[in-house]
Amino acid sequence: CGVPAIQPVLSGLSRIVNGEEAVPGSWPWQVSLQDKTGFHFCGGSLINENWVVTAAHCGVTTSDVVVAGEFDQGSSSEKIQKLKIAKVFKNSKYNSLTINNDITLLKLSTAASFSQTVSAVCLPSASDDFAAGTTCVTTGWGLTRYTNANTPDRLQQASLPLLSNTNCKKYWGTKIKDAMICAGASGVSSCMGDSGGPLVCKKNGAWTLVGIVSWGSSTCSTSTPGVYARVTALVNWVQQTLAAN
């Protein structure tokens, strides 16, 4: 897991406001969640052939579709996989008022077929520590300006630093809970449409899922940290859910 066949290229300046276009296929765990009309509403990450992790607040249902292997949503020539969802497992501790424990697992009806452009991200251990200041990457098809009417066709990426929760509370106060992790305030920001997608950090040479795009500034301010579900705090629930299903 966590080692793309097609290597990502990060210029360093990388909403996803002020991000940049990704190399096609270089984030092979990134999926697009689309409703039955084909409208992209959230991102997600493949953690194996049968399971996708996303945000609970995305409100995914079994009538939605997981699209894997996609880069350009405006292209009809890509070898994408449209995968049906068998079951939605929303974390029972998810609180829609505080947006805490913002994680949902999707069990696929048909397994994804792994390839150069479709593969899994690594999950961290509950004990893993990703230090404040670590540069990580978030990806998605979310708005590139909060005022835009439409999301971009092509997958965007941005490098951004992790913050400590103590530091993050300077911006967000008591809204920041233990199952959240903040990143950004560095000239880039996740934005609407990125939700559910990955915040990944490299650990021992493999990209590891550290956060799930959750919430942030309503204007996708690049000087305010974005808030992500903290995967280390939720990974035990993930492993238990996979084991039981």
From Swiss-Prot:
Cellular component per GO, a single term: extracellular region
Catalytic activity: Preferential cleavage: Tyr-|-Xaa, Trp-|-Xaa, Phe-|-Xaa, Leu-|-Xaa
Gene Ontology process terms (BP): digestion; proteolysis
SMART domains in the cross-refs: Tryp_SPc
Compartments reported by the entry: Secreted, Extracellular space
Protein family according to the UniProt entry: Belongs to the peptidase S1 family.
Name of the molecule in the record: Chymotrypsinogen A
